[in-house]
Curated annotation (Swiss-Prot):
Major location (coarse): nucleus
Source species, domain of life: Eukaryota
Organism field: Bos taurus
Chain intervals with Basic and acidic residues compositional bias: 1105-1121, 1130-1140
Keywords noted in UniProt: ATP-binding, Cell cycle, Cell division, Centromere, Chromosome, DNA-binding, Helicase, Hydrolase, Kinetochore, Mitosis, Nucleotide-binding, Phosphoprotein, Repeat, TPR repeat
Protein known as: DNA excision repair protein ERCC-6-like
């Protein structure tokens, strides 16, 4: 009723009034974006006087509330952070700890001094998140940055969003994450075209690096790219690192609590990314001049000369990286706090200045509990190490890593071995089936342990016996405990034993993919003391969580990587922990676990020496000792424990309660206890080691040579540019490549038989590298595999196919920005496309067209594995062969591009006589049509790097959070090819015959030539471009703003602009006093009243929400029609109903032919509720579209009548004309093919 009344009132307006109304609304929106709220209010009131409606009234109310809120407050006060020159909002500044202010000053010094990047490597739990948010607050307030890209693991998104809201409520923060491609794209466009922070994940970066690095088809330069948990790019050849380097950025900041986890090459990789190659030279030089001497010096059997050289080289390395690197440990911060006179002064005199005092951290005792193997474990361990047939029984490969994996399982629990191995080793009456071997870890787990009694499960493992007694004692004492393990099957056993003992437990592992559920369990554990145990996998639970309610941590099995275990411990030992923390690391005596621990100690000494934690830490073990992993030692006593006890026995920090607890631990039949936290408390005397070679100039010369080589490589501009162009950072620096493709000679190709899998073309190198990567289920893995070992063959077989199947142990795959082999899959986009391609290959007139525009279409498959023959040329199809058919995307009526919203897959079965009929009918009249059909649907690649990989999941594949994307994978990759349309300029505007048999989103997905593999997933990316720069006449519809005001300097509601044209209250505090004389109020986006900024954002974006209301839609559409009649000048935009596809091929080709190659078309994201704003006047009347629809229906009806009368040729003409208007009706398409078939027979 209200809608009809509003429509009637709008109908009463004259064309002049309608035009004035729309003009006022448009100008009011522009004023709002520019921050002039008074002018916006005035203009909205004028619009209301002409035509009052709910939409305008709502906007007026919002602006009035914002003005009132602003008027109530005076100026914000700002403070210079540590005299660095960066002004920070006072209230925010006063809530920061002193060391956090120093961190912000360090970040600003990088910007101020022209350094392009740096690493903030504070210990875990010291608030790196808060430091970054406060730094960005000051930078945005001073208008020094506009666009920031923040990349992090998926599990941390909610934490960052919560902290942004808490500290800087006025900052515009959006996420590029989630299943909705439209929403992701819209958020990215808002940040790129206005300003603010966009948050995304490493997986999203890998899948969408092109979209994140471009806007409207051009390179988009971010002011800052910030990586949290930056050790994800510790290897420069991982997918995360490669894609991150492809994002153009003026400045890069890395956040990590563990800058080195294994070796110094990881440190080089981080600095090479952060400083964009301008600090540590090339990897080869760094390895030779720095890594090798330092690593050798850390070994116990190093000569005095090697030790002295390593010491001096590490000192030199620290001096080089010092301006770019800041790391503080908890102990260092605590010591500084206790000796800081300013803090003590402020405590006595509160008026001196507000300094937020850091709370005291509790004591941490990190204990190593040396566990003896039970007789059963000891027996199996000895047999495995000594007997060949036992190795063959338990081993799937001869890889030494696999042997270590089996030995680690034996140390934890024999039931971790396969069901067959347990049965053959007489470990109870375990069932075994082939299915167990196929499905891996979890499938047989239930049957595997359900038949075993609790007592048996405990007695088979020394660790399990100790753990049950320990957890019972801790529960009785009222402590909450975290239990970490690398294996879900260990957690399954522990969970069952604890539940049977009536423990209240919670659990998080890789199978908990929903962030909401994770947050719920964490919150429950933090607030409810009844939950005494929290079970977590080290990979998932060890990153980004705060679990300070617990005061005890158990590491059930040690990791090869010392940082992994350290991160797990820091879930508890961080700011906010009020109780003393005790950590229990369970390690078995005389086994591979003890040697893994010794390896951890060796790595840790490297980290401490090179990052400055220790000048010269004590050398505990030699490299030779670390190599002896497979020797059998004393299972009753630990040599490592005895060695450490002799060094550190008297240094343990303890109290009466801890002493009593340690006495209890000794009563649990353990071999001994060591103190991990006392490691490296001893330093060697530097003088002692340097005396031997005090007079030698060799060391000094080596240090000078190393520094000279690194500096010369870093400062060599030509070398730097060459590295960038050869690598991924120069992907935007490369010149556009325009290659004239030659026609392929026509050859007689054999008809291929349908195969169950893709052929693989590998060199001997690749085969050996792939074989080397096959290891047993539960081996320790990095989160991302090094791609450098996997080379994809660039050789293309003569039949035109580009098959490549790589089997990897990995959870995901995507398109990389660097060329790693070129795989083109030729998919037909429609039935007519198939027929036309087939006859073209037979007649030879479409060879060039086929070669120029293969459809590089990528589709996700469901998680169940399949190998599919993806790329057969259509001339090779046999009779009744089933074709893998992709649903062609509907044409966007505004962009004239074919888009692909989701992968709708169907299977079409075509008899050969159908194709023959179509071929015969089209042979004479539609050669040009065939070419035109091919071109708009094909998507030329802009990046020559597409490939398909088959992936084999690891046993703990669920622990990688990227697995949660697999249920939405077809929605995650987004970049539509934009170059294809431009090639249609020279094509005759003829009719296109296209067939779409699947418009439904819920169409069942089917795949042909399927062969099931164990836990394999095929993940492909969406369409991408082949060449670096093709033609940008058609811009990417996902990269444009939902607003048309590109020429207007846009107001950022979150951050004031340094521009005299803006209202004074939005000025940065750094504006000169002469400008600020008329300022009513200055505000920071960190102030609480900056919530008004959010209101302004809502006003700006209101058309996207309110325009969904029927009244606003109908009334303003009516007003726009009236405005068109008035003849007022307006920008020309074609507006058609997106739900209809009335675009004829004539219109399409003419539109394309008139577009200029360099022109950037105005486009909108496909998900925007109202692509064109109210203020835009449109030209194309909807009557034409309605008329076209009517013509379409008439043509279809007439064609059916002619068909019934037997007039085949006339009926075919009508239906082809109908398909010119609307090409997506499957009924008409099939009818047309049927007529072609009949015509051919006659």
């Amino acid at each position: 009723m209200e809608v009809s009344r509003g429509f009637a009132e709008a109908g009463a307006l004259s064309p002049e009034q309608a035009a004035s109304y729309l003009r006022y609304v448009k100008e009011a929106k522009e004023a709002t974006k520019n921050g002039d709220l008074e002018q916006a209010l005035k203009l909205f009131n004028l619009a209301k006087d002409i035509f009052p409606n709910e939409k305008v009234m709502s906007r007026i109310q919002k602006i009035q509330e914002a003005l009132e809120e602003l008027a109530e407050h005076g100026d914000d006060e700002f403070i210079d952070v540590c005299n660095s020159g960066l002004l920070l909002y006072q209230e925010l500044h006063n809530q920061l700890y002193e060391y956090q202010k120093e961190g912000i000053a360090f970040l600003y010094s990088l910007y101020r001094d022209g350094r392009r990047g740096g690493i903030l490597a504070d210990d875990m739990g010291l608030g790196k998140t808060v430091q970054i948010i406060a730094f960005l607050s000051g930078m945005f307030d001073a208008s020094l940055v506009n666009h920031v890209l923040l990349i992090m693991p998926t599990s941390l998104i909610s934490t960052w969003l919560r902290e942004f809201v808490k500290w800087t409520p006025g900052m515009r923060v959006k996420t590029f994450h989630g299943p909705s491609k439209d929403e992701r794209t819209r958020n990215l466009c808002r940040i790129q075209q206005r300003n603010g922070v966009i948050i995304t994940t490493y997986q999203m970066l890998i899948n969408n690096w092109q979209q994140l690095s471009s806007l409207n088809g051009q390179e988009f330069l971010w002011d800052y790219v910030i990586l949290d948990e930056a050790h994800k790019i510790k290897s420069s050849s991982t997918k995360s690192a490669i894609c991150a380097r492809a994002i153009p950025a003026s400045n890069r900041i890395l956040l990590t609590g563990t800058p080195i986890q294994n070796n110094l090459q990881e440190l080089w990789s981080l600095f090479d990314f952060a400083c964009q190659g301008s600090l540590l030279g090339t990897l080869r030089t760094f390895k030779m001049e720095y890594e090798n001497p330092i690593t050798r010096a850390r070994e116990k059997d190093a000569t005095p000369g090697e030790k002295a050289l390593g010491f001096k080289i590490s000192e030199n390395l620290m001096a080089i990286i010092k301006p770019y690197f800041l790391r503080r440990t908890k102990e260092e911060v605590q010591k500084k706090k206790s000796s800081n006179p300013e803090v003590q002064l402020s405590e006595k005199s509160p008026d001196v200045g507000a300094i937020c005092e850091m709370p005291s951290l509790s004591r941490k005792n990190d204990l190593i509990i040396w566990i003896r193997l039970v007789p059963l474990q000891e027996e199996i361990y000895r047999k495995f190490v000594s007997l060949d047939h036992i190795k063959e029984l338990l081993m799937e490969t001869r890889s030494p890593l696999a042997e270590l994996g089996v030995l680690k399982k034996l140390c934890d629990h024999p039931r971790l071995l396969s069901a067959r191995a347990c049965g053959l080793l007489n470990l109870g009456a375990a069932k075994f089936s082939v299915q167990d071997e196929i499905e891996g870890e979890d499938s047989s787990d239930v049957d595997h342990i359900d038949q075993i009694s609790d007592d048996t499960l405990m007695e088979e493992s020394g660790k399990m016996l100790f753990l049950m007694d320990l957890l019972k004692k801790l529960r009785d004492e009222g402590h909450q405990t975290l239990v970490f393990s690398q294996s879900r099957r260990i957690l399954n056993i522990i969970e069952r034993l604890l539940k049977n003992r009536h423990f209240k437990i919670l659990r998080i592992d890789g199978t908990i993919t929903h962030l909401v559920e994770r947050e719920k369990r964490i919150s429950l554990f933090q607030q409810n003391k009844d939950y005494s145990v929290f079970l977590l996998t080290t990979q998932v639970g060890g990153v980004g969580l705060t679990l300070t309610a617990a005061s005890r941590v158990v590491i059930f099995d040690p990791s090869w990587n010392p940082a992994t275990d350290a991160q797990a411990v820091d879930r508890v030992y961080r700011i906010g922990q009020k109780e003393n923390v005790v950590v229990y690391r369970l390690i078995t005596c005389g086994t591979v676990e003890e040697k893994i621990y010794r390896r951890q100690v060796f790595k840790d000494s490297l980290i401490r020496q090179t990052t400055g934690d220790k000048k010269n830490p004590f050398r505990y073990f030699s490299k030779q000792e670390l190599r002896e992993l497979f020797t059998i030692e004393d299972f009753q006593n630990s040599a490592t424990q005895l060695q450490l006890q002799s060094l550190h026995a008297a240094q343990r920090r303890s109290d009466k309660n801890l002493d009593e607890h340690i006495a209890f631990l000794h009563s649990l039949r353990i071999a001994g206890i060591s103190d991990h936290d006392l490691m490296y408390t001893r330093d060697l005397s530097v003088k002692e080691e340097l005396d031997v070679i005090e007079d030698s100039h060799y060391i000094q010369q080596r240090v000078q040579k190393a520094q000279f080589l690194v500096e010369s490589e870093s400062q060599n501009t030509e070398l730097l540019m060459e590295r960038q162009k050869m690598g991924n950072e120069g992907i935007w620096l490369r010149e556009p490549v325009y290659q004239t493709k030659k026609k392929r000679p026509k050859v007689n190709k054999p008809q291929p038989q349908p195969s169950s899998h893709l052929p693989v073309y590998h060199t001997q190198e690749e085969i050996s590298s792939l074989m080397a990567s096959i290891i047993i289920d539960d081996l320790p893995k990095e989160d991302e595999k090094d791609l450098s070992r996997i080379k994809l063959n660039d050789t293309i077989p003569q039949d035109g196919r580009h098959p490549c199947v790589i089997t990897l142990n990995d959870d995901f795959v995507t398109t990389l920005p660097k060329g790693c082999g070129d795989v083109e899959e030729i998919f037909p986009d429609s039935l007519s496309g198939m027929a036309l391609q087939k006859e073209a290959s037979q007649e030879g007139f479409m060879q060039e067209s086929e070669q120029e525009s293969p459809l590089a279409s990528f589709n996700y498959l469901p998680s169940k594995s399949a190998r599919v023959d993806l790329g057969p040329n259509l001339d090779q199809l046999e009779d009744d062969e089933v074709l893998h058919h992709c649903n062609p995307s509907p044409a966007n009526p505004k962009t004239k591009e074919y888009q692909r919203p989701e992968s709708n897959v169907s299977v079409i079965k075509i008899a050969d006589d159908d194709l023959t009929a179509a071929h015969s009918a089209l042979q004479d009249a539609q050669a040009n049509e065939a070419k035109l059909e091919e071109e708009p649907l094909a998507s030329s690649g802009q990046y020559a790097c597409d490939f398909n990989l088959f992936l084999e999941d690891s046993a703990d594949n669920g622990q990688n959070l990227s697995s949660q994307f697999l249920e939405h994978v077809e929605k995650e990759n987004s970049l539509c090819g934009s170059a294809a349309n431009s090639r249609a300029e020279s094509v005759h505007s003829k009719a296109c015959l296209s067939v779409d048999l699947s418009e439904e989103d819920d169409e069942p997905e089917e795949v042909v030539n399927v062969k099931i593999r164990r836990k394999a997933r095929r993940i492909d990316s969406d369409n991408e471009d082949e060449h670096t720069f093709k033609d940008t006449s058609s811009t990417n519809p996902f990269n444009t703003s939902p607003f048309p005001f590109l020429s207007v300097k846009q107001f950022d509601a979150s951050t004031p602009k340094n521009d005299i044209s803006l209202p004074e209250r939005f000025f940065s505090p750094k504006i000169s006093d002469s400008i600020n004389k008329s300022v009513n109020s200055r505000r920071s986006l960190a102030s609480r009243r900056s919530l008004i900024n959010v209101v302004l954002d809502h006003v700006e974006d209101m058309e996207e929400r309110l325009d969904n209301s029927s009244e606003a839609k109908v009334v303003e559409d009516h007003l726009e029609e009236g405005a068109e009649e008035s003849g007022d000048e307006a920008p020309e935009h074609t507006k058609e109903d997106p739900s209809r596809e009335t675009l004829s091929s004539e219109n399409k080709s003419s539109q394309l032919s008139t577009s200029k190659p360099g022109a950037l078309a105005q486009e909108t994201s496909p998900g925007d509720p109202e692509p064109l704003s109210d203020g835009q006047l449109v030209d194309s009347p909807q009557d034409e579209a309605m008329e076209a629809v009517n013509d379409y229906d008439t043509l279809v009806l007439h064609g059916k009548e002619l068909k019934e009368c037997g007039k085949i040729q006339e009926a075919l003409d009508c239906l082809v004309k109908a398909l010119d208007i609307k090409s997506s009706d499957p009924e008409v398409m099939l009818m047309t093919l049927s007529l072609y078939k009949q015509l051919n027979k006659t």
